[in-house]
Amino acid sequence: MKSMLMAAAAAAALAAVDPSAAQGPAQGPAQGPAPAPTAARPTAAQAKAFVEEAEAQLEKANAFAARAAWVRANFITADTQWLEAKASAEQNELATRLAKEAARFDGVEVDPVTARKLKLLKLYIVSPAPDRPGAADELASLLTKLDSIYSTGKFAYKGKQITLNDAEDVLRESRDPAELKAVWEGWHSIAPQMKADYAQFAKLSNEGAASLGYKDTGALWRSNYDMDPDAFAAETDRLWKQVEPFYRNLHCYVRARLNERYGDAVQPRTGPIRADLLGNMWAQQWGNIYDVVQPKGVTSSYDLNKLLVDNGYDPVKMVKTGEAFYSSLGFSPLPQTFWERSLITRPRDREVVCHASAWDIDDKDDIRIKMCTKVNAEDFQTVHHELGHNYYQRAYKDQPVLFRGAANDGFHEAIGDFAALSASTPTYLQQIGLLDKVPGEQEDIPFLLKMALDKIAFLPFGLLVDRWRWQVFAGETTPDAYNSDWWKLRLKYQGLMPPGERPADAFDPGAKYHVPGNTPYTRYFLAHIYQFQFHRAACKQAGWKGPLHRCSVYGQEEMGKKFNAMMELGQSQPWPQTLAVFTGETRTDASAVADYFKPLNAWLTQQNKGERCGW
């Protein structure tokens, strides 16, 4: 799964902006609105005037940082890193100053719109800098350095230096456990050098969060969901309990097949699964080992990888196909500048950040994607996902600055994944001419198993990345326990273990982009719930009567209008109200996941008879 690059996610230039769009600061130091006289209690009129001035300054500040981040991500050099860090520091200072000024109006009775803007202004920063000279520069430099270590990471393998992309290819294709272990350990070897910088980053970010009135950075992050931070943590626990039994069913089945393939010496029939055997560097998606775990006697009649190649797809055609999906829902075509300015393939002449991301440069229509696209099934889905971010960014661009963002950050990820759910169906592949006919029901279990290997296998990982960071920010996990606590969580939630004993200096969380990239991760867990909730509602609106997993909403313009109406709201109101606009529901509900995968869960239960499930 790939993510959208948002404010603060690219490690520097975006460190101080709304977490739903790539925006940045203007060049040169920016000044916050002048504080009201301290002798008098602030008034509602002053609060409204402050918000208007703050929005004007933030809007003016965005273009430079967005471009600085874009240039650094596409041309990684010491100079572009310096430029991005400078832009990020200036923006962080501005946003921190505005957030502190917003706190002056706590307790002032203001109209609902101003009240929401004041609240969002205090939550505008993913990692606030402490309010002291040099702190913003130090924080920005740390984040830029961490991101760049990850993005330029290479390690020695078979006599040459290889990148993450190369390593991912090995994990995807190799079935040699010794080779898998070597490559897994090789990539994780790039991260120990991040550990000290990450600890210093966490210290500075916590200091900045405390200056805004939050217990720590984790509490600040959890405050972004229109509920108390502790209530939000409890909400994620509730959702996990809804899906955990299904995950354990899948884990049990996959472990048995791995045992049959590799034997007890590599993968025992009981206990945790070895993390390097699952086809993905972080074991967050397991679809690449479908050949190992596929049902006996039942095969899929098509291979999307082969269909794409045989039909002459190249990276640009992949993106054009994604655009056509959204056009079929009634959305306007992408602007010409999208095609002129996006990075769609990996350049051969320079280092770039290959992690797929969607960008909104100017809050108008300069939207772009950046990804090193390959012609395969995974990137076919990723293209549909990333474009979902772009269409969401475009939908809310006419909102005031502080409302230009997702209803909550899980929405931004879910909207792209919602589109990808349709794009993954044989129905859609037939609609766009890649298949002559839709396979019969006998292929439902293989199809659903492939989906579950990615969608359900992801859920515990989507939860634990931020659980680890919440512990770090709260001081519950200290630097000397960074790695051991990481693996405690991976065992608890995923039922996984590393392929061998980890070195004393290991910093395995740093081998996952979103940690050095400083992108909150719970959004992806939520997105994997919301996308099925959206899909169920959309299929109902489209009049679909068959199994939920066979529904494609391609061509449903009326449904598209209602979906766009939800997107246009941005974050102008609490997310439950926005959710209700499209789904009629005001609560996140994982029952849609169960509805989608119902036939598979029953089949897995049958297959697991006699197994000692759990770990």
Regions from the language model: what does each represent?
Residues 2-18:
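Gram-negative bacterial Sec-dependent N-terminal signal peptides
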Residues 14-36:
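Signal peptide processing junction and immediate N-terminal pro/mature segment
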Residues 35-200, 218, 512, 519-522, ...:
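N-terminal helix-rich structural modules
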Residues 37-47, 216-219, 284-300, 312-317, ...:
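C-terminal, non-catalytic "cap/extension" segments appended to globular domains
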Residues 161-164, 173, 200-370, 440-441, ...:
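Active-site-proximal, well-structured secondary-structure segments within enzyme catalytic domains
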Residues 178-185, 349-376, 383, 387-394:
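Active-site scaffold of zinc-dependent metalloenzymes
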Residues 183-190, 222, 229-233, 299-311, ...:
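Glycine- and acidic
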Residues 232, 236-246, 406-443:
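Post-HExxH zinc-binding segment in Zn-dependent metallohydrolases
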